[in-house]
Amino acid sequence: MEKGRVLESTGSWYKVDTGEKIINSRLPGKFRLDKKEVTNPITVGDIVDLEVNDDGSGNILTIHDRENYITRQATHGKRGEHILVSNLDQAFVVQSIRKPKLNEGFINRFLVTCEAYDVSAGIIINKMDLAKKGDHDFVEDMIEVYKSIGYPVYTCSIEDEESIEQLKSIFKDKISAFIGPSGVGKTSILNVIDPDYNLKVGEVSSSSNKGKHTTTFARLIPLEIGGFVADTPGIREFGLVNIEDWELSLYFPEMIEPREACKFNTCTHIHEPGCGVIAAFENGEIDPNRYHSYINMLESLED
């Protein structure tokens, strides 16, 4: 029996890295039937045990418990959740300053998911070479807000060697994930960080500035500098899953202390009297964009 990490999932076959070789493996039907609430019983990053067949292929026997993972609502009319990647040291939401435009709501949903599932998170703002007047001030303000609540923010451009070297130092010997919409440059960054992986780079539609999907399946890519990066399919929206409305504020670090002062245990932090979170917001201790993101998320959970 062999033990390894899942590097790629195409739906029916899984590439498993044992450290000595990569084995194309299948998953028995019982695993697919056991977890009906999950669209993918195995995800990239999973640690598995497998038996090797005479033809060199593998059969996955056991899926080890995950240390952490990133999940989102299933798409295309499917119910339940879709797990993007597991067993991470860190995960980064990638956005571009322009083409497509930065989406702070997406960032906040990603950060809430990371808080809920125990993943260290950070933010990468790409395509800074496209920044126009006012963009740099916007980014500086954003960096200040997110750093103050514990999230590192990195700015980069594939044209800026210094910023790429900084990312290399962050990814070195770590298992990391890149999550973001299509077109923000996730794959382009990976190509510069590790030129051995000449991954297909997608063009951004000039008519809509919304990226075309280029990475079809999630994959965990070994880096020349050591470690792995999970390159995931572009995601237009990041839907929360398995988070109750009453617990949402627990995943906003800046709300944890103020909520202790709330008069009511069931406080939603929107309209109740004696709310510590509302008081903190009105006193300027909580960023308005973050607070409004919280309200939008709460409303989506109540729908």
Predicted feature descriptions by range:
Residues 1-104:
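N-terminal accessory targeting/assembly segments
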Residues 105-120:
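Histidine-anchored nucleotide/phosphate-binding helix
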Residues 88-95, 118-128, 150-156:
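Conserved beta-strand/loop subsegment of P-loop NTPase cores
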Residues 12, 37-54, 65-84, 120-121, ...:
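Helix-rich effector regions associated with P-loop NTPase G domains
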Residues 130-184:
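Canonical P-loop GTPase G-domain recognition
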Residues 8-10, 54, 86-89, 117, ...:
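Short flexible coil/turn linkers enriched for glycine and charged/polar residues
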